[in-house]
Amino acid sequence: MFDNEVTEIMNYYLDIETTGLDPLHAKIITIQYMELERNTAKPIAPLKILKEWESDEKTILKKFISDSGIADGYKFSFIPIGFNLQFEHSFFWQRCISNGLQPIDIFNRPFLDLKTVAVIMNRGEF
């Protein structure tokens, strides 16, 4: 690693709430994320909840992008952990486009989708 590169791996619980299931027409109303300890997955920082009703959707998306590290070039600065991350991915991607922002691609970095883990633990059943 070079001296000026970030070398920490940061795991984050990630979840969103929306007004519907279609990212073209529904909007994100909350973004929740919390930094987790890498080895134990225990919370090491407070849960952050960005609320659309306190500002607007574009503002919470911009705040999430700027504060979380999700858009950093260093892929390990924000490793999302959540259940059914495809849902979050489709909303982040489309709602950023709808709000004139650079789309967030949470699958262009390491991630852990707990839905996959649950299916495996349930012998392939969902």
Regions found by a protein language model. Give the residues of each.
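Metal-dependent phosphoesterase core characteristic of DEDDh/y 3'-5' exonuclease domains
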Residues: K27-Q32, L36-A45, Y74-F126
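Conserved RNase H-like, two-metal-ion catalytic cores of nucleic-acid enzymes
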Residues: M1-I70
